[in-house]
């Protein structure tokens, strides 16, 4: 499992740090949060820094995860950001009418059939979903603000629409504070630690150890 891979990354002796290689357009906010909290917990326990290296993309849940690192490095053309929440679906009301299908649903609980795609869209149902999205979006914004700290300028956040699900190139992400610098994993870490540093990889992260 991913948790075991992360634990293995932090389990070596004389670890100088852990590098996360991130290439993700996003996913579940819950899973992103759980993984991030575990990384931070192990980082504090082992007293080692964590570095995130974004390859093609760290968007939405992928960026949530990147924020678990102490520093975020990107490539100039990496895609970074998308700090927002989305849900999507389809409506099949007219389709079942045309093909002559009668749908029968039996449920208990007023909201059990929330946003049923075979029923006309109900404004009350939509409000339930948008309220939930607003809550999760605020959690995401709070997390980014907490982890990036004073590297995020309040005026820049508003001007650039950072918390409005906007995406940025790696170069621009560095300018607005979503990333720290341009850099490739081995080059950055050799400059930071030692030219003779040893890289020990797992499926999900790289353990950095000095000779």
Q: In which residue ranges do the predicted regions lie?
A:
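N-terminal organellar transit peptides
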Residues: 1-75, 86-211
């Amino acid at each position: 499992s991913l948790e075991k891979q992360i634990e293995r990354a932090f389990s070596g002796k004389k670890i100088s740090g852990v590098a996360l290689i991130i290439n993700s357009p996003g996913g579940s906010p819950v899973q992103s949060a759980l993984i991030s909290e575990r990384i931070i917990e192990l980082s504090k326990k082992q007293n080692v820094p964590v570095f995130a290296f974004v390859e093609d993309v760290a968007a939405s849940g992928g960026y949530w995860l990147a924020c678990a690192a102490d520093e975020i490095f990107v490539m100039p053309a990496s895609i970074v950001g998308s700090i927002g929440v989305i849900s999507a679906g389809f409506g099949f009301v007219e389709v079942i009418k045309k093909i002559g299908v009668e749908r029968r649903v039996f449920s208990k609980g007023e909201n059990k059939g929330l946003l049923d795609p075979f029923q006309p869209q109900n404004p009350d149902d939509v409000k339930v979903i948008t309220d939930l999205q607003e809550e999760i979006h605020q959690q995401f914004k709070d997390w980014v603000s907490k982890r990036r700290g004073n590297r995020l300028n309040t005026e820049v956040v508003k001007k650039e629409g950072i918390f409005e699900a906007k995406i940025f190139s790696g170069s621009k992400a560095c300018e607005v504070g979503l990333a720290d610098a341009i850099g490739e994993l081995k080059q950055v870490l050799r400059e930071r630690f030692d030219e003779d540093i040893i890289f020990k990889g797992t499926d999900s992260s790289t353990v950095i150890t000095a000779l």
